[in-house]
Amino acid sequence: MEDQETRQNREYWFVVFAAILYGTITAGGQFFSNLGLSLYEISFYPVLFVSLILLPIVWTKRQYFIKKEMILFFVSYGLIGAFLELTQFGGIVLGVPVAIVAILLYSQPIWTTILGKLMFGELITNRKILAVSLAFLGIIFLLKPWHIESVGPITGIISALFGGLFLSLWVVWGRKSGIDKKHFITTTFGYKSFSAIWLLLLWPIVGFFIHKPNIVRLSISFPSQYWFYLLIFAVISALVPHLFFYRGIQKVHASIAGIILLLEPVSAAILAAILFAQAISFNLISGGALILFSNYLVLHEK
């Protein structure tokens, strides 16, 4: 019994570690944006690199290969991933302030708690409700939306709201892969490879509606060091955290994982302070403390 509890605690910490590493996504996105890469390039190339890195492993180790009965699952999961990439940036493109977009994206634990109940029968306890409420309050403290004069167009708001829903679906599909006992390497490869395919298929459609090169350009004419930076970014922000996340969520409920993942903006804010000399404010400290406390609540729920 003690060994089982130890193993379960280990799975929780796998998700915590993944959430912290996911915080590099924001800092990396800002870094590559400063270099002049488009949003589509920042989204697509790391996804492609993760797929290519794992391809030899999946190809030579047949136990990791995507079996025929898994294809439909990964086709749908990849589509969720592609829509997540597009909707999380769609609000910003359409003129919604970043703080509002982030708040709507991080409504994810609310959706995840509901979907976890509907799909997996996960209990919605008072402790979970309190943890979600504290975490969401922490996000509001982090982002300070009261400083914003306008929330932007309704189309951008809807896009960001759907981004939160697709982020939740990403967590829920990840949990389903764990319940179905798919290996975490298989899930990482399947999710990323099918997301890359869907991003390519959707690219001309997105380009039809959005004509800004800094959004939809997909070029290979980069200096060689940019490719190296993209490779490192893919490993740190996607490959490693995905492997830990999909390993952990084999045992961790989707609703709990959704709350733990709110450590990501705390990690992102700290990285921004270190890498881009952004100030560590009272709002960051208080918001981060609320999110950490919400994680304490779910990690110690009996």
Tell me the role of every PLM-derived stretch.
Residues 23, 27, 78, 82-86, ...:
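Hydrophobic/small/kink-forming positions within alpha-helical transmembrane segments
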Residues 54, 75, 79, 127-145, ...:
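Hydrophobic transmembrane alpha-helices of multi-pass small-molecule transport proteins
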Residues 53, 58-59, 108-133, 266-285:
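C-terminal transmembrane-helix exit sites in multi-pass transporters
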Residues 2, 47, 145, 226, ...:
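C-terminal-most transmembrane helix of multi-pass membrane proteins
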Residues 21-26, 59-99, 141, 234-252:
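Specific transmembrane alpha-helical segments of multi-pass solute transporters/efflux pumps
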Residues 9-14, 40-56, 72, 133-134, ...:
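Hydrophobic alpha-helical transmembrane segments of multi-pass integral membrane proteins
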Residues 41-48, 89-123, 254-273:
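Specific alpha-helical transmembrane segments that line the substrate/conduction pathway
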Residues 1-45, 87, 150-176, 201:
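Glycine-/small-residue-enriched transmembrane alpha-helix faces in small-molecule transporters
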